[in-house]
Regions:
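Structural/interface elements that position substrates and couple domains in central-metabolism enzymes
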Residues: 1-209
Length: 209
């Protein structure tokens, strides 16, 4: 339908009692887990809580959906898929924290690997050793440097802004991302970290939930 989610939320926000909930990856130690306590007890009592379970199915498959749309953008722009370097910004379960528990960014990472791409994750908020131990993902030391301090030497085919850390907007504006990417710059901006109009005006390929 080509309806922009942010525009819908802004319009709905003109109602005084509107509660704003944005689409994204639902991870962490509570929201992504606690509903199952309720559904388990409900089913023991003979009730099938379809609405809650449907919501969890959608959330649990969001990483796959984002990865698939990233691949579609590579195809649409004529970029390679096999061996494509893809940068993922952020791995904590939400913005501006260090907590990596039940991060759904890992779902994007694994799905991209299934397409034989080379996903790289950078998150200055996360503890490298914990991410390595928990998810077997070696975080970049910088957006162009591998965990072994070896330059990647190849630009990224796409960049996924997975977590809306303030530091990403401050340290990595669009012109910086353009410098490390093949043309056109593909930005998969899950929670709207960057300005959509600015991206499109600069000829970038932009997609968000």
């Amino acid at each position: 339908m080509d309806i922009d989610t942010k525009e819908v939320l802004e319009a709905a926000g003109t109602k005084w009692n509107f509660h704003k909930y944005e689409p994204g990856l639902v991870g962490g130690h509570c929201v992504s887990i606690d509903p199952y306590y309720l559904t388990y007890k409900a089913e023991l009592l003979g009730y099938h809580p379809e609405v809650i379970l449907s919501g969890r199915r959608i959330n649990d498959n969001m990483g796959k959906y984002i990865a698939e749309n990233t691949i579609k953008k590579l195809i649409e722009t004529g970029k390679k898929i096999n061996g494509a370097n893809i940068l993922i910004l952020g791995i904590t379960f939400k913005e501006n924290i260090t907590d990596i528990r039940n991060s759904r960014v890992c779902d994007i990472y694994e799905e991209l690997r299934n397409y034989h791409t080379n996903p790289f994750v950078y998150d200055p908020k996360a503890d490298w050793s914990k991410v390595d131990k928990e998810y077997n993902i070696h975080l970049l030391r910088d957006i162009q440097t591998s965990g072994s301090e070896v330059d990647l030497n190849k630009p990224y085919e796409a960049i996924i802004a997975a977590v809306k850390h303030d530091i990403f907007k401050e340290k990595y504006p669009l012109n910086k991302l353009q410098e490390i990417s093949t043309s056109p710059l593909i930005i998969v901006d899950i929670k709207g970290l960057y300005n959509k109009k600015e991206c499109l005006d600069n000829g970038f390929v932009y997609w968000r939930l």
